[in-house]
Amino acid sequence: MGFRINTNVAALNAKANADLNSKSLDASLSRLSSGLRINSAADDASGMAIADSLRSQANTLGQAISNGNDALGILQTADKAMDEQLKILDTIKTKATQAAQDGQSLKTRTMLQADINRLMEELDNIANTTSFNGKQLLSGNFINQEFQIGASSNQTVKATIGATQSSKIGLTRFETGGRISTSGEVQFTLKNYNGIDDFQFQKVVISTSVGTGLGALADEINKNADKTGVRATFTVETRGIAAVRAGATSDTFAINGVKIGKVDYKDGDANGALVAAINSVKDTTGVEASIDANGQLLLTSREGRGIKIDGNIGGGAFINADMKENYGRLSLVKNDGKDILISGSNLSSAGFGATQFISQASVSLRESKGQIDANIADAMGFGSANKGVVLGGYSSVSAYMSSAGSGFSSGSGYSVGSGKNYSTGFANAIAISAASQLSTVYNVSAGSGFSSGSTLSQFATMKTTAFGVKDETAGVTTLKGAMAVMDIAETAITNLDQIRADIGSVQNQVTSTINNITVTQVNVKAAESQIRDVDFAAESANYSKANILAQSGSYAMAQANSVQQNVLRLLQ
């Protein structure tokens, strides 16, 4: 071999290898000390880009999980508040049920109504004060609220919480048909009862016979109420228009085909003769008689059969001629507040004919709190007939209009035209029992007084009080009102349950999403770790290798430098 001293190639090779080993050792120490395989872009450019993307996704998913938990907190806050409201509604319904029996006096019912009013105030207080981070939850403003629960924009869950104030819940539909004065066979059909289909009930005969009448029709409707959502009640009552005066029935006097015969009775039926005679056959006729608080004769069919009076009951009973055949009024209730659409055949025998006056109203929980408007009261079925007023006690129509409680006031536009004083035109027993009957007494026109020749539409604006329909006291202070409050409270409970069910569905959706993105976040972090984090086992081996090479490199360099000393031996 040759000996050269100007260029020590062996030393240069040893130094070069030592430099490489030093860099490897530095890199290995950097990875071991940081725990990362990628400490700079130079370590793995493409790997770093992928790892950074995965880290961003994992961090975003972490915030999405936090957002989802916030959503759950909001929904749980609303749910617990509504749970308290449901307890309040349960109490309201219980108190309404307590008031719905005639063992209660007006005083005790008024106390119950006061309790109900306080409960409604608390229900509204909960609705108006329940909030989360300053955001109202139950006031009706929490609509289509979005929560970002994904790594990319617009990956959201929407939540809506309906209003729960007493003015917004409990909306119940009440419809009461006109008084039925003719018998017949009725085919009753509910249109679009579920938004799509019609429901046809079995045919029912409206008559005075056993197993017929509005009672039978109501039973047919109620046995399908779970499917249709419509329930029915009935009122079949014939009431005298004035307190009973002394008189006598005819020998041919009969009710529902059962002969009662001649009965002499006193003022107010003081001797009980008339009531006793009618009730002696009540098991056969289905009609029960009583004297009400105003001294008027009241005939009631509790089975829902018609009440038909044959012969002469006597003028002292003050039963209008048009009420001698009475099949009552049918009331329908629907708990979703929507209109009850009816079709069928011979609907006039059910009180829902095209020409009959049908009272209808949708009533919220709050509306049952105060005085019940006359129109709403009629829709709820307060009136057994379109009750009228007796004009026989007034010298003229104009005198009646001027009287207290007539429903008219000065300047109302209703007056008797010149020369049309009808004081002699009214017999003592003539009453206005319905708009249709009013036209048979005298036609009415608005603005020009009671004039002959007027059409039905001309008296359409007459106040309901003129027909004897009046406002009713608040809520449960009457039996009918208590029944109506029970219906409304039941609707309100259903409304809140529906809102809570919607909230529960969103809660389940959010919970499932959180569970899913939690797993996704773990997997994304695992993928990032595979790329970014160092494998300590492998890197320890690399470190040991680099460390040994560094030591051996130093020894090799020392040996390479000492080789030059061999040249001196040649010069000795």
Swiss-Prot record:
GO terms for molecular function: structural molecule activity. Keywords: Bacterial flagellum, Secreted. It is found in: Secreted; Bacterial flagellum. The keyword Transferase does not apply. InterPro entries: Flagellin, Flagellin_C, Flagellin_C_sub2, Flagellin_hook_IN_motif, Flagellin_N. It holds the Pfam family Flagellin_C. Disulfide bonds: none annotated. GO terms for cellular component: bacterial-type flagellum; extracellular region. Disruption phenotype: Has 2 short flagella probably composed of flagellin B (flaB). The mRNA is localized to the poles of short, probably elongating, cells; mRNA localization is lost in an fliW deletion strain but restored in a csrA-fliW double deletion. Correct localization requires protein translation; mutation of the start codon to prevent translation initiation or a premature stop codon (at position 3) prevents mRNA localization, a stop codon at position 101 leads to partial localization to the cell poles. Belongs to the bacterial flagellin family. Flagellin is the subunit protein which polymerizes to form the filaments of bacterial flagella. FlaA binds to flagellar assembly factor FliW protein, preventing FliW from binding to CsrA, so that CsrA can then bind flaA mRNA and represses its translation. PANTHER family: FLAGELLIN. Heteromer of FlaA and FlaB. Interacts with FliW. This is Flagellin A. The gene is flaA.
